[in-house]
Each structure stands twice: as structure tokens, then as C-alpha cells.
């Protein structure tokens, strides 16, 4: 199946692609304003999602990804304050697994957030996250 291209839009004339609109909506729902996330990070995120899904991700996949990005950017306290303890515990478990395995969509999202300087200092310290060349 051919992968569709994502689009930022152009001068208000051509609209943003569906995947970027869905990611923006999911980021807002996770209490991370989309304007705080660079467009390049959002584009890379939807491309990582497409790679993981083997095609277009379903709409229900965006909140899952947005929770990880919001947790990375807001830190544990900020995320919990906006999203509750249950969602905090779920995303913390996902981050722990991503750090331990170093593989998968969550690990790629954390690495993307680290390189984009979106990773909260408390998260870096608590989980010992760093990017090392091999």
C-alpha cells in the first residue's frame, strides 16, 4: 500500500494533511499546545507512526503517540496535572519499557524529543536518557 504524503499547507491556500491535523488535536487533548512542538517534529512523528503501522495510522493511534510526546515535554507533574494519575502511570510504564529495550515507536519518539530539545529535564534525569553514538 502506498504511503500518502503529509503536508503543512502553503500560505493558507492548501490545507494541512489529515495526519498532522489529527496529531495537533491529540496533542491539545494531552495538554501540549501544538504550537510548542516544531512542525518538523510533528512531521517526523507522523512518519514514524506510518512506518510502525505499515501505512496510514488509524485515528485512535494519535492520542497514544500524543501522550508520549506530552509526557516527554511536560514532565511527570505537568502531565499528571492535566491527564490524571492513571494515564501518567501508563505512559511511565511505556517509557520505562522504551528505555530498557531501546526499540519501538516509543523509543523513537523519546529519541526524537531528546534531539529536538523537547525532553523535560526531570525525565532525562529520572530515566538516565542520553543519545550516544555507537
Protein language model features and the residues they cover:
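Amphipathic alpha-helical interaction modules
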Residues: 34-95
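Amphipathic alpha-helical binding modules
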Residues: 89-134
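Intrinsically disordered, low-complexity segments used for protein-protein interactions
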Residues: 12-13, 25, 125, 129
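Alpha-helical protein-protein interaction elements
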Residues: 3-6, 56, 63, 119
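Compositionally biased, low-complexity repeat tracts
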Residues: 5-8, 74, 80, 98, ...
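Short acidic, low-complexity intrinsically disordered linear motifs used
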Residues: 1-21
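Charged, amphipathic alpha-helical linkers/stalks
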Residues: 19-31
Amino acid at each position: 500500500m502506498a504511503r500518502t504524503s503529509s503536508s503543512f499547507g502553503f500560505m493558507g491556500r492548501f490545507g494541512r494533511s489529515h495526519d498532522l491535523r489529527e496529531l495537533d488535536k491529540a496533542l491539545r487533548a494531552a495538554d501540549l499546545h501544538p504550537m510548542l512542538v516544531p512542525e518538523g517534529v510533528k512531521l517526523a512523528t507522523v512518519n514514524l507512526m506510518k512506518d510502525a503501522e505499515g501505512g496510514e495510522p488509524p485515528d485512535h493511534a494519535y492520542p497514544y503517540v500524543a501522550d508520549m510526546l506530552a509526557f516527554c515535554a511536560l514532565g511527570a507533574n505537568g502531565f499528571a496535572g492535566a491527564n490524571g494519575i492513571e494515564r501518567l502511570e501508563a505512559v511511565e510504564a511505556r517509557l520505562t519499557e522504551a528505555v530498557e529495550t531501546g526499540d519501538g515507536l516509543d523509543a523513537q519518539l523519546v529519541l526524537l524529543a531528546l534531539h529536538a530539545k523537547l525532553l523535560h529535564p526531570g525525565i532525562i534525569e529520572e530515566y538516565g536518557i542520553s543519545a550516544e553514538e555507537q
